Amino acid sequence: MTDVDVAIVGGGFHGCSAALNLARRGRRVLVLERDHVARHASGVNAGGVRTLLRHEAEIPLALAAREIWHRIADEVGDDCGYHTVGQVAVATNEAGRERLAQRHARMIELGWRHEQWFEADALRRWMPTLTEAASGGLGAPDDGAASPFHTTMAFARAARAAGAEIREGCAVTAIEVAADGRWSLTTGRGVVHAEQVVNTAGAWGDRIAAMIGDPVPLRYFLPMMMITARVPRFLAPVVISADPPLSFKQTPTGGLLIGGGRPARGDRDGTPDRIDLAGLRASADTVRRLFPGLGDVPVLRAWSGTEGQFDDGIPVLGPSLRAERVWHAFGFCGHGFQLAPIVGRLLAELVIDGRASLPIEAFSLRRF
């Protein structure tokens, strides 16, 4: 049997970030990962470090996280492949322009200034090969992108260096209260007793929550990505869109990384994901409409990951409603990568201080 202060279920980016922050504050931490670190969404996402077009409830967290990203090498001893390249949402018709203009006005009304309006000529100075149909856009020049697998592994190494233990291939099959009042977690590699439990199990977070009595209406999806052959550099910022869905960037080596949330087919219990070629083609067509001079570029590889989501588009972050000393952070709806550095810090605050330094009420389980 293993005794720790905090057991973290899930060894993705959020779990490793929580482990790092807790270990640095002197807690004995054990991360229990069913597969291996960065196996699922944390290692295969688009790597966007985005404050742009965030849900209003997420903005304080996203801005705080961005400050950490800007000094990420100081945080974990690794640059995580991070570059401040900016992110931009482009409108190509009047309806899209109006939606983005309304968003900009709303941000100003709320007192946020991280999103900036760009007229068409300013967009083309930023992206010279952009379509002439572009009529305006909303951008966040201080946003950026990083390497997701690289980043998650860097946080895992830093957590271990700070004293945390990470057990891979160690699925949690039951959680109950032990005779001494502590939490008892049954795993494939023995029993773990912990004073507190943190659930960062991603697309399986609802199952861990159910073990301690919290019913959660989590769904899962399998967002796809693809990478092309290298082409001469033509694009600096990350280009995003909600309608149609798109996340598009040129990597430092010249390849085009295209995603945006179009799903593959499959399940979360071992059935191999089946890439939806029609969905990939639709994403590629969107890129070519935005950058019509691009021409034909070979696609080298396509893949998907498994992510949890809620109907309202924001995660669960906060305490269990049914049990003491249990904390949840999952269901980030495909945009949790950027938030993980601050989420780990907030989880450490919740565990140790009993409160978070940023507003998290909107992410409570009480909303369901």
Feature locations, PLM:
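Glycine-rich FAD pyrophosphate-binding loop
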Residues: 23-43
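Dinucleotide-binding Rossmann-like beta1-alpha1 core, especially the glycine-rich loop
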Residues: 47-126, 245, 286-287
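Central helical "cap/lid" subdomain
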Residues: 191-236
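Helical element adjacent to the flavin cofactor pocket in flavoenzyme catalytic cores
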Residues: 138-195
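Helix-loop-beta segment of a Rossmann-like dinucleotide-binding subdomain
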Residues: 79-91, 114-120, 124-162, 264-269, ...
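Active-site lid/adjacent beta-loop-alpha segment flanking the redox-cofactor pocket in flavoenzymes
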Residues: 230-325
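N-terminal Rossmann-like FAD-binding beta1-loop-alpha1 element of flavoenzymes
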Residues: 4-30
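C-terminal catalytic lobe of FAD-dependent flavoproteins
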Residues: 289-368
